[in-house]
Amino acid sequence: MIRTQIVLNNQNIQFEGIQQNWEHPLGKFSLHKRPIESGYILSLDVKPSRSLQFQEVICTIPVALEESDQIFCNGFQSWSESRTFQQSEYIPNLKWFAKPFMKNYGDYHFKQIKRKKGFLHSWTYTYTTKKNQELFFVGSLSEKKAFTLFQWNIKKKELQIHIDVAERQIETPIEIFSLWIAEGEEHQLFDTWGQLQGISLPPQATVTGWTSWYNFYTDINEEKLLNALQQLQATFPSAHYFQIDDGYQKAVGDWWRIDTKKFPNGLVNLQKQIKDNDYQAGIWLAPFICEPKSDLYQNQSDWLLKDKKGKFVKAGYAPHWSGHFYAIDFYQEAFQEYLAKVLHFFTEEMGFKLLKLDFIYAVCLFPRKDKSRAEILVDAIQFIKTHAPKAKLLACGAPLGPLFGLVDYCRIGADIHLKWEHLLLKFFRNRERVSTAAALTSILARHHLNNRFFRNDPDVFILRSDNHQLTFQQQSTILKLATLSGNLVFNSDEMSKYSPESKILFEWFLRWKDSYIKSVRTIEKDFYHIEFEHEQQSFDAYANLTSQYKKLPKYSKIAPYETIVY
């Protein structure tokens, strides 16, 4: 039986089953169950009798778990590792000594999460995969109002659903959550889930481009980027975007202060050259964070987000900046005025057509009395859309669910690393780590979001021969999986230096880039069977992300880190 627990004004309210206008001195509570589309919608309404403040909302539903069922767990934000799990697995906590540096990247500060054997957790949606490959699916229809945390209790065969409304105050009737629970085939379920949220994206060919980050990182200047632009024009004239990433500004947070030692002409000349070469210009912004050396931090400290003790909130740690960086309070009026001017400068005055918005999670680290974390995130992105109406938005480092239908593109995995794995960050158990292995796992797991809720950004492929420690087999797999799972695919290479083998792989990308994944089946951990369509024909692919040979039905074996398409 469904059980509901609501903690309001420090009073614990519990009831079982479906309820209509269940009365309590604090108000009326209704849990509705409405049949729809091979399942039902479960929603909770509250009509308060006075001003109320939530501490907790939990709904627990029984689930028919079979031993062979795999459980999909969606990570907290873009970079958070996401995949299907065996029931014997669990998601471990970040190591204690890493928490001062990394805890705010993900969900490590959510105390209600059980991180031990017998429990798994997911955000926004989750599902089990049955032996017949059909899914039992549970997805939020109200993620713009509050984050939804799903916690599986394997032994009890229960799914505990936490609604992130802690500290939220209400005085008028409100729908606390709305969930769609259904069974069926993957492709149809995700189509219906999008339709139930009122999201309909028109077909769009894959968007391509070049970004400065994965070759130069912050070591960019006008000369390097003009040379890269010239090379791109000579080798990939049909690309859409040329995107300037981190490193053009003097400090994170000071978007006005272009580093004139690197860019003596500012960005004006470079942007003009990009446009003259028939590319659209993109720019990187991290609008809701700043580093200590920035003017913003030093002179506008009242804009910074503060915790309950009045201390500035650390959003993370970046050794290539000033170490710890800090979250900004979006609702500071002076900050909003500043951000509006920054957006106008880059999009209207400078003519940038793509805004890569990074570290978005930082805007919603803490709820407010009048806003949940999700509502804060939606307000912030709506603000950017309002003040940059002509620009396409690429979100990165962002909780995904509230951005469905709001942004044009969204990163669906971690940053690609110049090695296969970042062993130190993996040892820290950082699920948001820079990692090629983790990135590929997540982009396959989240393939179903593409062209339904936004266009997927799987991150870059790397085909160059220098400045990385990837094998050619690994490079090939990165390119193939990005091609199949993404709708915005960039690279950072000096393409004129491609080897003959790299050129062949690049031609493969051009040939297959408008493919569409129908399903991904986890054969075993890090070994996948992919069914996809291209030009109305069906194809299969196998991706082996392990260091071992694997057996295939039509081939004798597949090599470590190899992806085969047939």
Give residue ranges: language-model regions:
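N-terminal accessory beta-strand-rich subdomains and adjacent acidic, glycine-rich linkers
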Residues: 1-191
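Conserved, mostly hydrophobic/aromatic
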Residues: 44, 171, 210, 242, ...
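Aromatic-lined carbohydrate-binding/catalytic grooves of carbohydrate-active enzymes
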Residues: 206-210, 215-344, 348, 352-354, ...
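Flexible loop/turn segments at secondary-structure boundaries
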Residues: 216-220, 249-253, 288-293, 362-366, ...
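Alpha-helix-loop-beta-strand connector modules within alpha/beta enzyme cores
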Residues: 267-274, 373-391
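Glycan-recognition surfaces
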Residues: 297-337, 382-496
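Carbohydrate-binding surface patches
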Residues: 478, 482-485, 490, 521-563
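Aromatic- and carboxylate-lined catalytic core of secreted/periplasmic carbohydrate-active enzymes
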Residues: 479-522
